[in-house]
Amino acid sequence: CSSDLRHENEISGTTDVANHPEFADRKTTKTIDGAPVTGWFTEDFTLAELKTLRARERLPQLRPGNTRFDGQAAIPTLDEIIALAKAASRETGRTIGIYPETKHPSYFASIGLPLEGRLVDALKKVGWDRADAPVFIQSFEVANLKKLKTMTRVPLIQLMAASGGPADGAEPSYAAMATPE
């Protein structure tokens, strides 16, 4: 598994993986956050294999104009996105940052691929492990944000859904989190 950047670890909706017969045998069903998900998963590929895939618009019905870029770009790594943000900052004279979301951190920890260390290491490598860095880390889970709080000084954002609670089973529910104390 690599520090690749996709919206989900199941990549059939954001890449052309289904068009690669050499990866057909990797299609599988996994339980992610308590629900079965069928497809191809980043954790089953090497970075070199992921780099052979091409990105595509995840929600073409919502963003039809973006489909004109389908197939043009490889899957970026976190390091590549950070470099892109830094280059854009230099070119424009404006601060360009990143807003990574840790997706399914409990799942990744359960399979021996915790996300937090790799994310913080990447930020430290470029001097972005500080409170005023152009970075906000977001997650729908609670436990990994608590862990990140001990590892980094960048701002952490608790995401919430309209109903239910964090996939890591942490209390309180999202509704209770949104209630003033």
Where would I find each of the regions flagged by the language model?
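Phosphate-group recognition and catalysis centered on beta-loop-alpha active-site segments
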Residues: 1-181
